[in-house]
Amino acid sequence: MVRQALGQFGQIDILLSNAGVTRRADIMDLTEADWDRIHRVNAKGVFFCLQRVAREMIPRRSGRIINIASIAGKGYEGTSNAAYAASKGAVISLTKTAAQQLAKHNINVNSVCPGVTRTALSEDNLRVRAQQEGVSVEEMERRRAAVIPLKRANDPEDIAAMVVFLASPGARNITGQSFNVDGGLIPD
């Protein structure tokens, strides 16, 4: 992936690590295989991608690294999977450590922590939950919105807006931060 990007563009100025898998499961139902798969993608993949791209950014003394974490990694009680929450907590910790170590190379590292976001996967999960609870999808959407202080789930564009800002010159002195985009679910 990095070689391909370098071949096509000549350099990498911005890395957006957006990796995430999960499985809706109670903590007592998670298996070692679940844990390993979730951490392999969500934490290990982000780490090694960050490391590889940082090697390209260091000689140029410039770069922006933006990791997509989750409010689950900050202890949001609505999280449905402990392995997922732990993996996203690892991404938040990685962001802070990488920011400290890469600052001397003028590389900014931040993370975005989305809350409930409308995606094909989340909407499929909403339909499954509605069916399991014997209610309409519309009722599940109302329930979901009711717990969010701004009364709406994110659209992907809400996350993208924060990413664009963090990649912009306006964020040149921001590093080591994890920004919630969650409608106020877990204020920091």
Model-derived regions, located:
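Residue(s) in the substrate-gating loop at a strand-loop-helix junction
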Residues: 70
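Active-site helix of classical SDR
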Residues: 50, 87, 95
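Substrate-binding pocket helix/loop in short-chain dehydrogenase/reductase
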Residues: 26-27, 34-36, 65, 144
